[in-house]
Amino acid sequence: MIRFIHHFNYPSEVSRADGEAWYLGTHVPLIRELPGVVRYRSWRQIDVGIPYPSAGAPTPHNQFVRRTELCFEDHAAWQTAYRSAPQLWSRAPERRLGFGEFECMFIGEEPEFDLLRDAPPQHYKYITLQLWWPGGRPEIDENEEIFIDSYCFFYAPHTSFADGEDWYLGHHTREGKQLPGMRHYRTWRMIRVPEEPGSPLKPNRWARLTELGMSPTAYIANMVNEETRIRFTRSPLGNVIGGWMNISIKLNQVDDFLHPGRAAS
């Protein structure tokens, strides 16, 4: 199974209501007719009140209206579907119904690491390092409902993939999994694929997709509030992240376009 993940907005001067009416009423029915579609689900953006810009919420933050996945048995099946109707993925002109900003990637069915359970190899050489809490570890209510901060990033041009992974998996996620209130933490390495000639889609731009799950209160205490937030270890190479994007969602608030009414799993 391969998952074609896409995040998008509607063009400027197109209202959210009009964009959703186009997406649900025009685009989705056409996608359902493509050959080889195994699963088709979408999550709407939610606003959980994370202030930005801030240390834990860089700008832009929560900038997409939806995260959607379209699943096929393999990449060849996706190619067949895409080539049958490439116009479905074109960007719309300003003030016209269709897609505005659109970012996509391919990932596998299962994460590379379920970080609350798994230890990436990069963890081990840094395992004895302690977390830096200048104000002390914050107290968190573990029973509050969580949201998912679903984010993607790529490494800076001056950073090799290996050096970027050493920092992200060796430091950032090793520290992140220890944050109080962290209850969901999974990361996928992107699957690189041959890009379609002339296509506007650039699925190989990104390095990883990560899902981080905690309550809004925990997120703010751990990563936003200057008095309580952790100070993550910085890379000696400087800023190794070249680009970043995210959307806030709840995994159980999902539109299943192939099986309307089916409960989220």
Q: PLM ranges: what are they?
A:
Residues M1-S265:
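Macromolecular interaction modules
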